[in-house]
């Protein structure tokens, strides 16, 4: 798929039948269109397209929006904006890390923009932060256009591995990590494997007893069929605790995104009641204070509407 210039009336689609039409840049506007949310689209007014490129894996675009600052788009789908990225990055990171005492070794799968790294670095107990991102272009673009997000790469505890996250995990010795955070895009294209049962089995093997995983888990308004499958797989694989939490992100489809929070068999993990507060003051001057996460919103994120609660609490039991 080639993303059209916003001064062109092309709708952003190619003629290749194998390449789905998943976005368009019409005069002055970017519209996010995807088969994952049929019948609806979210649009942002474009001031200027800052970058367009095609990596070995996906189309990459950055544009300056009128209301949400700079926007990172992969294969036509918004990944982050300067205005609301905090709601996603802080929650996917601190929900797991604030639920266990003194995490020391953390692995991030995906997350090439560096935002999760930034948030992991707030935890002073952490000694090693590994990240495996498949697309080098995402890392380079983030460092160039989103320095306040990519600041996470400046932490000396960070070890960057460019490659496939599934293959990386298979080579990790069993019980290596206290926490694994899977910051994936939607389950199409290069991220599809990150939503499948064998991947979760590999994560469980890489975690210590009582270790935790946090993974992007779609929207309860749009993807309950995907969430059902994820929950069923996680209940089968993770013998500790399995929970679904969510947060609001205005520029994500339906305005929200969910997370699976799971732990391996071992020391009990109560995700709903954080026990490991962040020493935010010690990092505030370097990466800025928290904008979204706090202990109250941590606990509230596990409260589900009735229709989702019925499905999630019964699936796999």
Swiss-Prot record:
Domain PABS: 27-264
Annotated keywords: Polyamine biosynthesis, Spermidine biosynthesis, Transferase
Top enzyme class: transferase
Enzyme Commission number(s): 2.5.1.16
Binding locations of putrescine: 88, 183-186, 252
Disulfide cysteine pairs (residue numbers): none
Catalysed reactions, semicolon-separated: S-adenosyl 3-(methylsulfanyl)propylamine + putrescine = S-methyl-5'-thioadenosine + spermidine + H(+)
Residues that hold S-adenosyl 3-(methylsulfanyl)propylamine according to the record: 58, 89, 113, 133, 164-165, 183
Family recorded in the similarity comment: Belongs to the spermidine/spermine synthase family.
Name of this protein: Spermidine synthase 2
Source species of the chain: Datura stramonium (Jimsonweed)
Phylogenetic classification of the source organism: Eukaryota, Viridiplantae, Streptophyta, Embryophyta, Tracheophyta
């Amino acid at each position: 798929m080639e993303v059209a210039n916003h001064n062109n009336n092309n709708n952003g689609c190619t003629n290749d039948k194998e390449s789905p039409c998943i976005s368009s840049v019409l005069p002055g506007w970017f519209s996010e269109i995807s088969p994952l949310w049929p019948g609806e689209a979210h649009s942002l007014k474009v001031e200027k397209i800052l970058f367009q490129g095609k990596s070995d894996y996906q189309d990459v675009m950055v544009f300056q929006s009128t209301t949400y600052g700079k926007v990172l788009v992969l294969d036509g789908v918004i990944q982050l904006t300067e205005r609301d990225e905090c709601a996603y990055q802080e929650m996917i990171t601190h929900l797991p890390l604030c639920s266990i005492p003194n995490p020391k070794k953390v692995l991030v799968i995906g997350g090439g923009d560096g935002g999760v790294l930034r948030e992991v670095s707030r935890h002073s107990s952490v000694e090693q932060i590994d990240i495996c991102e498949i697309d080098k272009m995402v890392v380079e673009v983030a460092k160039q256009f989103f320095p306040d997000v990519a600041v996470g790469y400046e932490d000396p505890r960070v070890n960057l591995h460019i490659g496939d996250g599934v293959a990386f995990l298979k080579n990790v010795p069993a019980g290596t990590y206290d926490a694994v955070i899977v910051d994936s895009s939607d389950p199409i294209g290069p991220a599809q494997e990150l939503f499948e049962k064998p991947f979760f089995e590999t994560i469980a093997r890489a975690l210590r007893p009582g270790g935790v995983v946090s993974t992007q888990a779609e929207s309860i308004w749009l993807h309950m069929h995907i969430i059902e499958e994820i929950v069923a797989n996680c209940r089968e694989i993770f013998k500790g605790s399995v929970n679904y939490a969510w947060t609001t992100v205005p520029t994500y489809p339906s305005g929200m995104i969910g997370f699976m929070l799971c732990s391996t068999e071992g020391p009990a993990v109560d995700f709903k009641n954080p026990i490991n507060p962040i020493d935010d003051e010690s990092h505030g001057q370097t990466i800025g204070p928290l904008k979204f996460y706090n202990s109250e919103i941590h606990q509230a994120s596990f409260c589900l509407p009735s229709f989702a609660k019925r499905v999630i609490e019964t699936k796999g039991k």
